[in-house]
């Protein structure tokens, strides 16, 4: 088995074991024990061992989940770190209790970052237990080793990371007991009961565990080796990640496209006709556009073509995690991580189904109960008042497009829940998920589209309009947006206006003509919405809906990747109008400049992610994947050379504020003041100098710029220690060749009161 090659992980983990029979009837055993006479206790010792109470141990990922499971199982007795009752022990992991050990664990010399130590490629992987979670690990280890525990149920999150969390603890505890897997998509009591009635053999998920383990090891190898390599070569800490760096490359590339973009002006002639307007083609020659406008002004336009089509717009599919994060960012302004956190809370509160899903459909066994759920959700949502609700279950049922988990939907518990008591963020996400369910099963949006072509002065002009036949799902969407204080308009609203009845050959008077000037626009800065979309397709602009997706990261990991890019200083969130843009820092651009293709290529990294999926499906051996990662790193360390001219690339450019009064060199702002950049010159204006501190003022760039240019600067809000009041005055620079001194001039500019 593959598991036998995992160093400290026992190969017995991967041995498939037969399921156990259900536990004996507890009351019957208690009654049988009660008829034994006291004198027979010693004689019955052997029999007692055989009839000892047996338990099944359930290990969840979080205490809150364990509590919900225990309530359904009847494990009501609280113990230290677990719950007990009805033949069950229920405990929890507190997330990642253990993880891959750091480099220094393998060799103390690795504590210091040195080029000669690279690449660091462990032969036998080691794991360490988080210090702040040691107590809970000890509880789990004791439970896993108890003789009365006959079977272990893995109830950690039903996904790649949940599998890794459980298996790591199981193996570190030295456990070899049979594993059963709880795999559910909802925390509703009914879903929990059904899940425990259909526990699966743990061996069914060996591939999932191997994929999770390979992902963790690959991230460790790339992070440790590439980060150390580039940090040592470029003399500053540069965090590099297997998925993080290609994601950053997408953003840097977009910024380069924006910077290189040169807008091209264009001109469009617009004619006002009775009841509507038409537009001509874009023209690059302004004079020609003016000439056409003059020719059309006061003239007649002839209708050349009228084309009417009945069209239908299908409802949007249900949410997977990524599409929900995108909409929540665009409509609500939430980051991907905020949306995931809110959705996780709703899942644990039994109000939404499993969050980390990549499917947008439901399974056929859910079809029968769907109309009831839709009605419950509709009644709980205030924005749908007055709108008829229907349920086309067939539109959202697609068994082949559901793998581990179905789409995110509300649960029936929404009926009893007090939604007003939910935190604002959770309520907003629940409403968005509810809206999508109601829209997805609603009728299509039907409309008649009219396209008209008119001729005037030998040029063609066009217009489009539409008449709504059935608002369908768009009525719900419009009602939801109307309930929000501010929300983007629906797509297509610009063409919702109907055109008047027109006939080919009809002549229309031109009431007015105008030339509208525009410019071609650059690509847009990434937002979390558009970046998540790019990560799904590894930067490809288009991808067929049915294509095998090879994206950057997974729905479960993308939010964390974005947050790390921000926390490490590579990305900045900058608000622009109603959107928050993601902009790369100076260091981000510098890093992508020096990174080789194999570390920044989105397509190559997406291929790695695809191979992890192959490991999960049993189509690729884990060691083949890992050997590819190791070979890449060996080549990288052995062949990479510092790019000439980039030695100082990671020193942020200093903004020059003026010329030095002593040597004529450049004076630039730094953290503690303004300094001459000529190393032989000592001119400095310190931000925290005693003179400025007494005035309770700090020299700004504007003040220093004026002092260097004119020798004086008008400063407001200076503090008087004598009167305790503030005043305005002119500060004069008085440099004696050793120190930059200052004095006040109250006579140069009137009006500043002392």
Predicted region positions:
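N-terminal amphipathic/hydrophobic targeting modules at extreme N-termini
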Residues: 2-12, 17-19, 25-29, 33, ...
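Intrinsically disordered, low-complexity regulatory segments
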Residues: 42-216, 220, 484, 522
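Basic, low-complexity terminal or inter-domain segments flanking catalytic cores
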Residues: 48, 53-57, 79, 133, ...
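Conserved short loop/turn motifs at secondary-structure junctions
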Residues: 54-57, 155-158, 235-237, 308-317, ...
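Amphipathic alpha-helical transducer elements in NTP-driven molecular machines
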Residues: 63-70, 87-94, 130-141, 146, ...
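C-terminal or mid-to-C-terminal helical accessory/interaction module adjacent to the motor/catalytic core
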Residues: 189-273, 308-312
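Metal- or metallocofactor-binding catalytic centers and their adjacent structured scaffolds
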Residues: 286-319, 325
